[in-house]
C-alpha cells in the first residue's frame, strides 16, 4: 500500500517588497529570485488550489496555501511515477520544487476534487486519499490508498488550561491536572497531543473535530485495528505535535459520503 507524509516549512520565501501571487509586482535584485521561485511553485498548483491561493490576502497565509497545493502536486507526481512513499519527509519550498523537477514531466495530469457531505476533500481522478493540515509556518500532508486523517499543531503559547476545561472530557482534564502538578511543560505538550489526535480522527471520519472534543478517544485510537502515528517535530525555530490516523474498522469510502 502506497503511503507518504510530508512536513513543509514555508519560511525562507515571503511576499515582502512586492513579491506576491501570480500577477503581482516584480522586485529587483534578490527579490527577482524569490519571484521566479514563487512562479515556479504556482505553476504546480491545480486550477482549484490556484484559485484558493489567489484569494488569500495575508502573506503567511498565501505561503501556506501555496505550500499545500504544491505538496498535493508532489504527492500525485510521486505516486503516478511509481516512486516509493515515505512516511516522514521534511521539506522547504525550494527542496519541494527541486523534487518535482526530478520527476517525469508527464506525471502532471490535472487534479480534480470532490467533497463529502461534511466538506472533506477527495481526489476525484487519483486513487489516493489525503489529509492536509497547517499551523505556524508549516504544512503537513498525509496521503494513502486508504482513508486517512492528519493534524499538525504548533505548540505556541496559549491558554491551554482554559481550552481544555472548556472542551476536553473529564478524564482528560484530570490527566492534565495531574501532569500540571508534576511537570507543567509536559502537561502543555499533552494538551496539544490530545488535540492533534482528536483532529486527526475527525478528519479521518469526515465529521471534523467538534463531535470528538469532549469524547475521550485515546484508548480507542490505540486499538489493534488502528494505525496511529504521532510525535513531536521541530521545523526552524518552531516545535509541533502531529498525528496521523487510519483504521480498517468502519472504513468509509467516497461513495458512502
What are these regions (language model features)?
Residues 1-257:
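Core catalytic alpha/beta fold that binds nucleotide/phospho-ligands
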Amino acid at each position: 500500500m502506497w503511503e507518504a507524509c510530508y512536513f513543509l516549512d514555508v519560511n525562507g520565501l515571503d511576499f515582502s517588497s512586492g513579491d506576491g501571487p501570480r500577477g503581482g509586482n516584480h522586485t529587483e535584485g534578490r527579490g527577482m529570485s524569490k519571484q521566479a521561485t514563487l512562479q515556479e511553485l504556482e505553476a504546480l498548483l491545480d486550477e482549484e488550489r490556484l484559485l484558493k491561493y489567489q484569494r488569500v490576502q495575508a502573506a503567511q497565509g498565501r505561503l501556506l496555501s501555496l505550500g499545500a497545493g504544491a505538496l498535493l502536486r508532489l504527492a500525485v507526481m510521486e505516486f503516478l511515477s511509481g516512486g516509493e512513499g515515505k512516511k516522514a519527509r521534511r521539506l522547504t519550498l525550494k527542496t519541494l520544487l527541486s523534487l518535482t523537477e526530478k520527476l517525469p514531466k508527464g506525471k502532471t495530469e490535472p487534479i480534480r476534487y470532490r467533497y463529502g457531505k461534511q466538506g472533506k476533500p477527495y481526489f476525484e481522478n487519483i486513487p489516493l486519499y489525503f489529509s492536509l493540515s497547517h499551523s505556524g509556518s508549516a504544512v503537513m500532508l498525509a496521503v494513502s490508498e486508504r482513508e486517512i486523517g492528519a493534524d499538525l499543531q504548533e505548540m505556541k503559547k496559549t491558554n491551554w488550561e482554559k481550552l481544555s476545561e472548556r472542551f476536553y472530557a473529564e478524564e482528560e482534564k484530570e490527566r492534565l491536572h495531574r501532569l500540571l502538578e508534576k511537570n507543567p511543560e509536559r502537561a502543555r505538550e499533552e494538551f496539544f497531543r490530545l488535540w492533534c489526535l482528536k483532529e486527526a480522527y475527525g478528519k479521518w471520519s469526515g465529521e471534523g473535530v467538534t463531535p470528538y472534543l469532549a469524547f475521550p478517544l485515546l484508548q480507542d485510537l490505540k486499538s489493534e485495528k488502528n494505525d496511529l502515528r504521532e510525535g513531536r517535530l521541530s521545523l526552524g525555530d518552531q516545535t509541533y505535535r502531529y498525528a496521523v490516523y487510519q483504521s480498517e474498522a468502519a472504513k468509509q469510502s467516497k461513495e458512502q459520503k
